[in-house]
Amino acid sequence: MTRFLLLMLVCGSVWAKPLPQSVLLYNDTTGHHLIQSNADTVRPIASITKLMTAMVTLDYDKDLTRTLKSAGKVGGILPRGTWTRGEVMHAMLIRSDNDAAETLAADYPGGRSAFLAAMNAKAILLNMPNANFGDPSGLDSKNVTTLLGVKRLLLASSEYPIIREISVKKQALFDHRFKKKIRKIELPNTNKELLFEFDNIVVTKTGLTNPAGWCLGMVVEQGGQKYVIVILGARNKLERLKIAKEIMYNNITDTDLR
């Protein structure tokens, strides 16, 4: 039955055609690729980039209590504030804030250019095919790799406890002080629909730009197995969500969790 569902999935009959540009389901425990669509196509990955930004940031300094100054809006909140690195990391991984990614890059020794060099060096270390990073946020359409590259990025990020903790929070709540005023900050997760429905997601990151389409990367642990799901180039949020749910329910999650 599972094999039949997988065949339907790859052929595109489970949802409206056409399939996104690239779809992958990988069982890291067995080493088997269960679903692959356009696996070798080099594509922009949008804000999935921010997982690389998080890893390079943590490789440099895991202290999340140190404060940073942002000239932009972190999480679309307040300009020119002073933030802890933890708050900035939450804004980037949960709310997918681009200024948060730029703030972390600016804090790196040698600044933004050195940070980008470190991102590309990390991509080589992870053996991400045809990977290139032109900015820390994913807005740059030159941030590209293949499904295999995103898979390796996700698996590497799942080895960072801080990324596992932050990326799957349904929302973040904290107080932020600016000019003697305290403002309550609420950051809902950009992948909140799946996080509310499934409790076995251990890393997640969404992405969206016009060149990349609607993107999603997840690491899922179920029944002693570790899976990677990648969706690149969905036409809209609903299609991305529908494909992810079909993969989860038909191939990973126990049916009694529906």
Locate the predicted segments by residue.
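Penicillin-recognizing serine hydrolase domain
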Residues: 17-22, 110-258
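Sec-dependent N-terminal signal peptides
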Residues: 3-12
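Structural motif marking the loop-to-transmembrane transition
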Residues: 1-2, 85
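Active-site-adjacent loops and short helices of periplasmic peptidoglycan-processing enzymes
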Residues: 15-148, 152-161
